[in-house]
Amino acid sequence: MKEKIIKTKVGQLFVSYQPAEKIAVFLSGAGSLPTYENFLPVIRKLPKNWGYLTIDYPNTGQSPLENQENFVLDDLVQSILEVLSQFKVIQYAVCAHSISGLVSVKVAESEQFCQGLILIELTTYSVLYGELAQNPYPEFLALQEKVQTLGGGYEYLKKIGQESFSVADFKILWAKAERSSDRLKSVQEGFQHYCSIAKSDFQNLDISFQFPIFILSQAYREQEYKDSEFASQNTQIILGGSHHYLHWSQSEKIVELLLEMG
């Protein structure tokens, strides 16, 4: 495995790369989790002819701090394309969590080498700007109460991750996430953690791809995805799991889907 920091439009990005005939590109959602460790339950199950490329966004994981105040989503997409180009990745599928589902669709729109998308509990327009932003799912509100009852995010993630991670792997994941988030306590006022994501970024998406799109979702979100901007003839919704981090609990299924693509 190669680890490298690559200079891009939005700042320096920390990446982990294992070359192979085919590449699984992993993108984490919002938060401070380092991408390699976040997707380790999937990465450990990849067959030998599949390599991987994991990318930490600015201010996340092991990527350096960089104010994102002046950057928009297209800038982040361009930066991901720069990383793919540097490693000459030409046969790949993207496995993306949460808001990175939108990022991965934009990446696939921009060039021709993507062979499939696995979108895990991806963020829709409705959740960020629409009906579900105004009236969240009861399940989501119940989750917030559960996290508080357990004593915070660490205890909750530890509980749901214990079946997917060894104790040692989870400690590494959380230690790196804490180091990443602790850095943000000392940034100056006005520092923006993420690039700006506008309503227009969800509109006029071109998802008429010739490759499969798999959406992994908890059952209660099925209709949201059927009605979303990500629905198409090539989109298949796969229900399962009982929490947002389905790449932990459904890692075997994700590997099966990758193998279907290649």
Regions found by a protein language model. Give the residues of each.
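Short beta-strand immediately N-terminal to the catalytic nucleophile in serine-hydrolase-like folds
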Residues: 94-96, 120
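Catalytic histidine-centered segment of alpha/beta-hydrolase-like enzymes
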Residues: 242-251
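Gly/Ala-rich beta-loop-alpha elbow adjacent to hydrolase catalytic centers
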Residues: 96-100, 104
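Conserved HGGG/HGGXW glycine-rich cap/lid loop of the alpha/beta-hydrolase fold
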Residues: 13-62
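Active-site loop/oxyanion-hole signature of alpha/beta-hydrolase fold enzymes
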Residues: 44, 54-93
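Flexible "cap/lid" loop of the alpha/beta hydrolase fold
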Residues: 117-150
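Conserved serine/cysteine hydrolase catalytic core
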Residues: 176-241
